[in-house]
Amino acid sequence: MRRIVTGVDATGQARIQSDGVPTQVYTLPGNGPTVYEIWNRIRILDFLPEGRDRSSYDQSSLRKHPSWMGVAGDTAASFAGHCVDYCIVLLGEMTLIRGETEIMVRAGDVVMQRDTKPAWVNRSGRLSRVAFILVETALE
């Protein structure tokens, strides 16, 4: 994963400010995804295929990051919050679980999550990658 950030320096010139791996990368327990914090509200997650265990995760990394994400059951990663999430499948395919409903999403598909807590499971047998863009909404 490579992140390139552009900006303007003190003289007003456009510059490349950074080029490399995102500074915040962490892995969630068990079959949890690897999370790449691209920017404040943009995350890209790599989901291992269901059934593969990632037993050597760093417990301390979980304590450093906000609890916007949890692991439900053994393999389904679920997300909570008062926001609209734009979920863009970049690589592979995922199963989106909401209550009794399951739907397959593939590379190129976009899911809009509105104040819901669905679970995501990778049943494809290969690595899958999903970008999440989080937009907070006000509670009424």
Where do the PLM segments sit?
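N-terminal leader/capping segments at the start of a protein or of a new domain
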Residues: 1-41
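A short beta-strand-loop-beta hairpin characteristic of the jelly-roll/cupin
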Residues: 72-106
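Short, ordered coil/turn segments that flank beta-strands lining enzyme active or ligand-binding pockets
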Residues: 10, 90, 123
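Conserved short histidine dyad/triad with adjacent acidic residue
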Residues: 22, 42-81, 114-118, 136-138
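Short, surface-exposed charged micro-motifs
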Residues: 4-5, 86, 110, 119
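Extracellular structured ligand-interaction cores
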Residues: 1-3, 42, 81-84, 93, ...
